[in-house]
């Protein structure tokens, strides 16, 4: 899979851009704050309809403009797909091959993209919300059902939390309605948790292999899904998970009513990263965090390929400077000949040119782009 051409209008600091990409390696070079990351963000947004930097689409529309537009042609092994997005302050619309999609879940997955940025170091030691967002972005683009259930979960969770708040301030007293909301939420939660467990098992296998290679077989990485409902085990089926979530709601009802919020479920779950059986959150050095993050990204590539039969597009946002030569070599060797790769950097020093053969180099300055031979 590769992005052959790309157009954008009024996105961040770019007024207008039309560009053809190399199917293999594309490098964006230039000083900081000129638009390199904005361009990668635009490509990522074309794939997932979400930014990795903000939850507000309004921030993506160039100042003074009424809307932003993105468009690109994706080449897959069996077909070509034209993708188009239009962002306004009131929402976004998506088209696939000029047909407007009624739901974004029908659009996401047409182009798979994996992003690796310095912020990914927070995957290990950052807040649980970072790891949940990682799961949702990754699994949502490889399984449309996951994306659907996630959307449904957020809606019902908001309803349930609102009703719990009403109960907490004595403005409501109908516990039967709370039971209805609890049953709905538990059913959706079970679908999400079941899929997360399944995909984390697969991701763990690929990440272990990559981590072993990068660390020279010196360390063993393990990734575990940690449900907030402690009774859930990796072997539970959807029905069993549902029953355990419902039981948790009943057990925690007085506390949830008192606090006015749902205290367990996918929105409270987490991931554990272990190095040689020790929790990396507590013990990992910065170098080990980099190796874990890199291993997870390489595992994502393999997971997408396993489930879609296509290698995703890889976006490397200013990470080459964060990796030493050994980790750079591991990354570039791993992706060589597999993925179309986009790299941002302030200069060309330090990149392993013996692996990156004949990249296409673009210079970016103040939201404009020009090409030159590497």
Swiss-Prot record:
In Swiss-Prot or TrEMBL terms, this protein is called DNA replication and repair protein RecF
- Matches recorded under InterPro entries: DNA-binding_RecF (IPR001238), DNA-binding_RecF_CS (IPR018078), P-loop_NTPase (IPR027417), RecF/RecN/SMC_N (IPR003395), RecF_2 (IPR042174)
This protein's UniProt keywords: ATP-binding, Cytoplasm, DNA damage, DNA repair, DNA replication, DNA-binding, Nucleotide-binding, SOS response
Gene Ontology terms: biological process: DNA replication; DNA synthesis involved in DNA repair; double-strand break repair; SOS response
Q: Name one GO cellular component term.
A: cytoplasm
Q: What organism does the UniProt record list as the source? A: Lactobacillus johnsonii (strain CNCM I-12250 / La1 / NCC 533)
Q: What is its subcellular localisation?
A: Cytoplasm
Hydrolase as UniProt keyword: no
What this chain does, per the entry, is described as: The RecF protein is involved in DNA metabolism; it is required for DNA replication and normal SOS inducibility. RecF binds preferentially to single-stranded, linear DNA. It also seems to bind ATP.
